[in-house]
Amino acid sequence: MHRQIWSIAEHGPDYVVLTLNLPDGLGGFPGNRDIMLRYEIEQACLTMTATATSDAPTPFNPANHSYWSLDSQPGYGGQQLQIAADHYSEPDAQLMPTGRILPVDDSPYDFRTGRNLAGDDSEFYDLNLCLGATKAPLRPIARLTGRDGVCMEMATTECGLQLYDGGTIDGRDYPTHHGAPYGPYAAPALEAQSWPGSLAHSHFPDIILRPGAPYRQITSWTFSAKQIG
């Protein structure tokens, strides 16, 4: 969907509503799909509400793939990440889920109490952290704290969080606010979604969007700052 042109259906001083219509068969997926995204800012909180309908059963597991750079300094080494996940989906050598759900205890994926990120190839993160077995009411699930003291608290209704370290970022064609393109390990991505791989593993949460049962996701990012030093 990131390569599609969305329409602005509505907008105001603190919000925008985007819509997208995907015809049956586009991308190899069945169903005419109507998707709506609402982004709204209230004080220091950005909230995304995603809804979708389909006139035929179809796989549907969207995720916001924003990269989060909270510092004025390059890279994200030394930033602290905390994630409320007790388990993760084991990936194989091709990064596909094996179907095994493993505890994060004594693994590189235990972020429950917070850990500093290296932000380089000494670490590797591209996997799903399990926040639960089903959707839930909006609740805090992750916190990223930058070296300059900027904090981002992420909340979501989703049952999974894909953590990606940004090791293959190639932004040569996309100049940034600073004028220089982003490269590998410029920033991590925290992607709220259902567990990837559910079509191959029946014990994973269901991601089929069915007629009469609209999809709905709420994810928010709240920012604050603390004194460093």
Please provide the spans of the model-predicted regions:
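An exposed, glycine/acidic-rich loop-and-rim segment of catalytic or binding clefts
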Residues: 1-229
